[in-house]
């Protein structure tokens, strides 16, 4: 029925999309695209008390920002409760599941006895073969008849052969709560099977769920998918990645001025590699990615590597793409004259899009204030006089090369060096001692504007 390789990403909308979740989504997306398959998005929103519409919206926005296009409509588990109830009934009718009338007090008493005997807490199966009259006042749960002995074995695409002893890890676990709502493992199996999911790539925090899900696949007569359990992302201190290591919400990276191309490139390398290559476009990855080559061990988050990749993409992406991302941050470079030249001025040194935004503002807008530390460090009576003479002799220079040649000739005549003039020019033109090449800034602003800014600076400094 389902011939295509099909993967899925299935987040719970109880919080915003974590970068670990985005990496999982990316791996599933790439594997599907490489094989001409389907990549599905399912929102696991059965926990009606904890669900957040804002979180659901943020997940979908993050997908859109990153360019991960899913196939078909988004599936919402909250719209499928009737379907889950049908399959609970099927298992009950076939004798593969049963009603359990154990009260809360009985369960607590059982756990206390097991703890006293230093046994693993587990349900004891007392209602497994129950045929009597149900106790009054108890809303039953539904439990699956799980195997009580033997092994559950599966081949994991990352970890290799994985074995679980049934008696060590499993009791007759609940598939429907007393209010009729289905449990996580049950809904996952129903949805993956009915949506035709052939390959499940997910974090290895789900590894312990897998034997329970295999029991359900077998009880329901569904084909078991291939599993790939990916190790967690750790911080540079070797501990599980958390907010203390930096941003974890995907959309925080957008606000920080990180490009989606850089973030995806960064994340794919946290657990997967292709030789010594570091830079991959999404199109490259659709051809190269192979989940069987995912590392078994945890990967380490490296903020410097992300910064390096972001700088690379700022340098190399076309103007239209950079400006599209800038617009999402509320800044449109295209409103300026010579916008392409302005971007080229700024992109060589920029590490984030905010460097582009701040740099553009400092060049395009005449400074209202001057960096006092820079003024104290670089400005003195001698170079103010040199700056005045420089402005007075500027005439008809056009290109950066024109300005460079003119400046060198000017300095030679004045028996001065570039270090005596470059920073005063930079401060006068931009208000700061940090900017792109001073000759390119002169070219961008042109002679009249340069003269005006230098004169204004000299006036402010009391010259």
Curated annotation (Swiss-Prot):
Function: Catalyzes the attachment of glutamate to tRNA(Glu) in a two-step reaction: glutamate is first activated by ATP to form Glu-AMP and then transferred to the acceptor end of tRNA(Glu).
Cellular localisation: Cytoplasm
Reactions it catalyzes: tRNA(Glu) + L-glutamate + ATP = L-glutamyl-tRNA(Glu) + AMP + diphosphate
EC numbers, comma separated: 6.1.1.17
Family, per entry: Belongs to the class-I aminoacyl-tRNA synthetase family. Glutamate--tRNA ligase type 1 subfamily.
Record-given protein name: Glutamate--tRNA ligase 2
Any GO BP annotation: glutamyl-tRNA aminoacylation
Motif ('HIGH' region): 11-21
Main location: cytoplasm
Organism: Campylobacter jejuni (strain RM1221)
């Amino acid at each position: 029925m389902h011939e295509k390789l099909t993967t899925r990403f299935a987040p719970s909308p109880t919080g915003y999309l974590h970068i670990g979740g985005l990496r999982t989504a990316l791996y599933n997306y790439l594997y599907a695209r490489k094989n001409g398959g389907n990549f599905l998005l399912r929102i696991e929103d059965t926990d009606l008390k904890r669900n957040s519409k804002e979180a659901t919206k943020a997940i979908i926005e993050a997908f859109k920002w990153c360019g991960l296009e899913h196939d078909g409509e988004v599936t919402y588990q909250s719209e499928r409760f009737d379907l889950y109830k049908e399959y609970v009934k099927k298992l009950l009718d076939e004798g593969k599941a049963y009603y359990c009338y154990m009260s809360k007090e009985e369960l607590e008493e059982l756990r206390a006895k097991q703890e006293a005997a230093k046994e693993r807490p587990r349900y004891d199966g007392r209602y497994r073969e129950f045929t009597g009259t149900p106790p009054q006042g108890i809303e039953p749960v539904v439990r699956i008849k799980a195997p009580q002995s033997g092994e559950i074995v599966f081949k994991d695409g990352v970890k290799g052969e994985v074995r679980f002893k049934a008696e060590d890890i499993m009791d007759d676990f609940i598939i429907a709560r007393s209010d009729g709502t289905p449990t996580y493992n049950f809904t996952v199996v129903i949805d993956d099977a009915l949506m035709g999911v052939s390959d499940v790539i997910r974090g290895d925090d789900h590894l312990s769920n897998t034997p329970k899900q295999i029991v359900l696949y077998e009880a329901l007569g569904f084909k078991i998918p291939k599993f790939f359990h990916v190790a967690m992302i750790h911080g540079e201190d070797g501990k599980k990645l958390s907010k203390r290591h930096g941003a974890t919400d995907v959309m925080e990276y957008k606000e920080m001025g990180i490009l989606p191309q850089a973030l995806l490139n960064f994340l794919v390398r946290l657990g997967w590699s292709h030789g010594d290559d570091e830079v991959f476009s999404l199109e490259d990855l659709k051809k190269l990615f192979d989940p069987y080559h995912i590392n078994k061990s945890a990967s380490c988050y490296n903020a410097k590597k992300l910064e390096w990749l972001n700088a690379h993409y700022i340098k190399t992406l076309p103007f239209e793409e950079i400006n599209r991302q800038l617009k999402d941050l509320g800044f449109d470079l295209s409103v300026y004259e010579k916008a392409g030249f302005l971007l080229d001025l700024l992109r060589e040194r920029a590490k984030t899009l905010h460097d582009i935004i701040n740099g553009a503002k400092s060049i395009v807008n005449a400074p209202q204030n001057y960096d006092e530390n820079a003024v104290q460090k670089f400005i003195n009576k001698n170079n103010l006089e040199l700056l005045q003479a420089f402005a007075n002799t500027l005439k008809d220079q056009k290109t950066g090369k024109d300005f460079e040649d003119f400046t060198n000739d000017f300095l030679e005549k004045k028996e001065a060096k570039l270090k005596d003039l470059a920073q005063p020019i930079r401060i006068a033109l931009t208000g700061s001692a940090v900017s792109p090449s001073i000759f390119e800034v002169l070219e961008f602003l042109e002679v009249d504007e340069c003269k005006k800014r230098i004169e204004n600076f000299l006036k402010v400094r009391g010259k």
